[in-house]
């Protein structure tokens, strides 16, 4: 069997990639050891949002953080593609993006999140630091130990 592109993994990323490649005329084959979209993509916790993972920088691994930061425009493009896919297909693909929080329990962590947000915004991500009543209103389930958060809708 011949194919232009073989995609290993039939989850949300593999199937999406196959769709967009096939739409452009590429002969694509998707293989997976399970039925498509039945593992993590079909039964995940539902946290789908774009946000920089900062714990690498908090641990001093700035090189790894820089590599992730360089990929942020791709993550943003991926989010736009989900909406494009729904319009093309004419039905909801059941992908919800309700935003995400990265929390701080100390003043040092909060200052770090403020720097992180500045970098995210510079790269085109809509995010912001929330504290106090605004944070409690947004996420009343958080512990009182949380003094602030980076919220990315």
Predicted segments — roles?
Residues 2, 6, 38-44, 48-50:
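Accessory recognition modules or surfaces
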Residues 128, 143-144:
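Membrane-embedded alpha-helical core segments of multi-pass
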């Amino acid at each position: 069997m011949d194919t232009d592109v073989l995609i290993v993994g039939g989850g949300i990323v593999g199937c999406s990639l196959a769709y967009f490649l096939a739409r452009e005329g590429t002969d694509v084959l998707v293989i997976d050891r399970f039925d498509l979209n039945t593992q993590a993509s079909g039964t995940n916790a539902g946290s789908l949002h774009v946000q920089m993972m900062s714990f690498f920088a908090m641990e001093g691994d700035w090189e790894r953080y820089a590599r992730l930061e360089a990929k942020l425009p791709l993550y943003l493009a991926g989010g736009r593609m989900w909406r494009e896919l729904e319009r093309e297909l004419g039905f909801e693909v059941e992908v919800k993006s309700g935003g995400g929080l990265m929390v701080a329990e100390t003043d040092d962590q909060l200052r770090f999140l403020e720097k992180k947000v500045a970098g995210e915004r510079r790269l085109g991500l809509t995010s912001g630091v929330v504290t106090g009543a605004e944070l409690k209103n947004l996420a009343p389930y958080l512990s009182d130990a949380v003094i602030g958060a980076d919220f990315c809708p």
